């Protein structure tokens, strides 16, 4: 993976992490420990999500269900550019 691709991936993960944090607070979970408990996750596992760790889609779906947010709503303000790869 090119350095520029890695930078883009990190920026996208950071945007997703920020969105998680915003939605958590908007839904009344004052800190990450409370939502981690509700999700039956360890505090450290959830904390990694809010700090930009890569994670599985099924984890995001579980979080969205708890927060009563659709995936479409979750991603609405997150810009993920299309691939720049050329077709052969």
Segments and roles (model prediction):
Residues 1-11, 75-88:
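Short, charged recognition helix plus adjacent turn
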Residues 1-27:
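A short, Lys/Arg-rich alpha-helix, primarily the initiator
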Residues 20, 35, 46-49, 74:
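Conserved hydrophobic/aromatic packing and binding residues within compact polymer-binding modules
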Residues 20, 31-32, 57-60:
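Helix-turn-helix DNA-binding elements, focusing on the entry/boundary residues of the two helices
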Residues 24, 36, 64:
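The alpha-helix within a helix-turn-helix
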Residues 28-47:
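Short alpha-helical DNA-recognition segment
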Residues 49-50, 67, 75-78:
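DNA major-groove recognition helix of helix-turn-helix
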Residues 52-65:
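Short, basic-rich loop-to-helix N-cap that marks the start of a DNA-contacting helix
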């Amino acid at each position: 993976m090119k350095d520029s691709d890695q930078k883009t991936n990190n920026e996208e993960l950071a945007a997703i992490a920020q969105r998680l944090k915003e939605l958590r607070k908007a839904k009344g979970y004052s800190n990450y420990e409370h939502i981690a408990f509700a999700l039956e996750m360890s505090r450290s596992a959830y904390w990694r999500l809010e700090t930009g760790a890569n994670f599985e889609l099924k984890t995001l779906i579980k979080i969205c269900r708890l927060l009563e947010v659709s995936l479409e709503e979750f991603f609405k303000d997150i810009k993920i550019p299309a691939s720049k790869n050329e077709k052969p």
